């Protein structure tokens, strides 16, 4: 039943979001870094839904199943960038070093999922496109939104002599 599917999709998505946030808290040991780590997912999800709406892609059973996968995969780029930023404290250096690796791993993941578009079963193709878009938008969010957040964080939480 579609109502069961929607409810299960919602539950699995909420579980994935909460689990990822807890893991970020354990990893970074600071709530501010855990929230920053969630930013690529938030913006990536909004952009993904927007792209799907504009392009006429409808949510279906396979797309709903893709959402927890996007959460699990979409968080990776941001985590790598955050860890490097905590070491370097220089956004340009972070993106020149770790950014290259993150770009290549994201592109290979997107191509792997995008290849599902050619599947005979249309549901699998739809899932592949959703994953392609979702992973891509999470990456773009990591690339464009996270550096702005770094700047804001540094200004808000810098010691008085650093402001």
Q: Positions of the model-derived regions?
A:
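Membrane-embedded transmembrane helical bundles of large multi-pass transporters/channels
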Residues: 1-163
């Amino acid at each position: 039943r579609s109502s069961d599917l929607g409810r299960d999709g919602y539950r699995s998505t909420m579980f994935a979001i909460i689990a990822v946030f807890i893991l970020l808290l354990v990893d970074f040991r600071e709530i501010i870094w855990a929230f920053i780590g969630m930013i690529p997912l938030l913006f990536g999800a909004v952009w993904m839904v927007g792209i799907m709406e504009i392009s006429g892609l409808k949510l279906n059973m396979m797309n709903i199943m893709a959402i927890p996968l996007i959460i699990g995969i979409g968080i990776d780029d941001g985590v790598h960038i955050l860890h490097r930023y905590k070491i370097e404290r220089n956004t340009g250096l972070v993106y020149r070093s770790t950014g290259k690796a993150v770009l290549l791993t994201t592109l290979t993941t997107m191509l792997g999922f995008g290849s599902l578009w050619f599947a005979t079963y249309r549901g699998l193709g739809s899932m592949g496109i959703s994953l392609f878009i979702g992973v891509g938008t999470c990456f773009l969010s990591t690339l464009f939104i996270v550096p702005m957040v770094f700047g804001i964080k540094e200004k808000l939480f810098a010691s008085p002599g650093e402001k």
